[in-house]
């Protein structure tokens, strides 16, 4: 394997490992959401942030390899570099494909988790609005101490 391909291979291997960790955290978060263990959600924020910081660092290393070869620091530049090393280092192409697959998986899981969170939040907001309306309480306090009005758009009952 040429030295350039070895550097690229190590860089991609690092990104793959980082993405696997990130996907695992997203799957754990998803299980907490599915099972209603909402008190556990806060514990995922720090590992996700650490993963994203590391993935950003590793991605920058890959982009630097592209720039060092006078290529554009984007997907087109990466594909051009891979074509140059296709015969001498086919494992680098396989690593790139795995990276793309893991990236798509992470994106899908993150979107799905966001949808699950939004659904739970909507349900909580509707329940609070119903409770405040039934108790004829015009609002509540937000975390910063400001007043938050609770008004439903639907009449719950007519006496």
Predicted regions and their residues:
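Extended, charge-rich alpha-helical scaffolding segments
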Residues: 1-84, 94
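Short terminal interaction segments
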Residues: 80-159
């Amino acid at each position: 394997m040429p030295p350039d391909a070895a550097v690229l291979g190590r860089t991609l291997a690092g990104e793959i490992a980082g993405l696997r960790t990130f996907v695992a955290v997203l799957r754990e978060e998803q299980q907490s959401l599915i099972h209603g263990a909402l008190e556990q959600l806060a514990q995922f924020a720090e590992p996700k942030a650490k993963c994203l910081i590391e993935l950003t660092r590793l991605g920058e290393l890959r982009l630097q390899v592209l720039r060092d070869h006078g290529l554009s620091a984007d997907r087109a530049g990466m594909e051009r570099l891979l074509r140059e090393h296709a015969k001498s280092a086919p494992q680098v192409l396989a690593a790139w494909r795995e990276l793309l697959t893991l990236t798509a998986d992470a994106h899908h899981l993150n979107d799905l988790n966001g949808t699950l969170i939004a659904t739970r939040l909507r349900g909580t907001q509707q329940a609070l609005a119903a409770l405040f309306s039934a108790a004829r309480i015009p609002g509540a306090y937000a975390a910063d101490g400001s007043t938050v009005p609770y008004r439903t758009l639907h009449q719950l009952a007519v006496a």
